[in-house]
Amino acid sequence: MINNEDFLDEIGDSHFSSNAKNPLREDAFDITDEEKIEKIKKDVENILQTLGMDLTDDSIKGTPNRVAKMFVKEIFGGLNPAKQPKASTFDNNYKYGEMLVEKNITVYSTCEHHLLPIIGRAHVAYISSGRVIGLSKMNRIVEYYAKRPQVQERLTMQIVQELQKALGTEDVACVIDAKHLCVNSRGIKDIESSTVTSEFGGKFKDPQTKREFLDYIKLDTQF
């Protein structure tokens, strides 16, 4: 019989979840961003003091506030649904019927297990069923879902599901190739490895269509 803490240590980097949503509490937005920053600032101060750091030193006395603002306003800003980009779509007046691929979208996210960076590229494609979306909106959707504590599998699914909803079609695909600093800089410390995840919907489940998409992106990510 192991306790819950031992269990969490045992599963380590194993990824499991009941759905594609981030695990947020119901009261996640009961306080303002400014209140969150103040609370996190005090928590970071406590961590640094516990580590023995001198918070009167000019180099780090502003660190708690910087970290708190970074968490709330920047790297975890995608947790706030008020910041979700508007996925405007338009009629496919050109009657373009082939797949559209947006390659090499920059991914900056954060591993929710160790709060270390995930850095990589996303490749997203869809086949229009009558609606099209602005190219930059695809980048913004990737950025929005990346700016939160994440696992790469969930991020890949969220991007596809958001585009499926916006475009009114199942014919959406996403591949992400990313480095996880929780693997590269700690633990096994394998600086060469990267993680590839994929999600294929609708016509992209067809082997020929999937092959066409993969040929377009020619996965060889440069980090």
Swiss-Prot record:
Gene3D superfamilies: 1.10.286.10, 3.30.1130.10. Homomer. Belongs to the GTP cyclohydrolase I family. Pfam families: GTP_cyclohydroI. Pathway: Cofactor biosynthesis; 7,8-dihydroneopterin triphosphate biosynthesis; 7,8-dihydroneopterin triphosphate from GTP: step 1/1. It comes from the Bacteria. GO terms for molecular function: GTP binding; GTP cyclohydrolase I activity; zinc ion binding. It comes from Flavobacterium johnsoniae (strain ATCC 17061 / DSM 2064 / JCM 8514 / BCRC 14874 / CCUG 350202 / NBRC 14942 / NCIMB 11054 / UW101). Its EC number is 3.5.4.16. NCBIfam families: folE, PRK09347.1-1, PRK09347.1-2, PRK09347.1-3. GO terms for biological process: one-carbon metabolic process; tetrahydrobiopterin biosynthetic process; tetrahydrofolate biosynthetic process. One of its GO terms (cellular component) is cytoplasm. Zn(2+) binds at residues 111, 114, 182. SUPFAM superfamilies: Tetrahydrobiopterin biosynthesis enzymes-like (SSF55620). Keywords: GTP-binding, Hydrolase, Metal-binding, Nucleotide-binding, One-carbon metabolism, Zinc. This is GTP cyclohydrolase 1. It catalyses: GTP + H2O = 7,8-dihydroneopterin 3'-triphosphate + formate + H(+). HAMAP family: FolE.
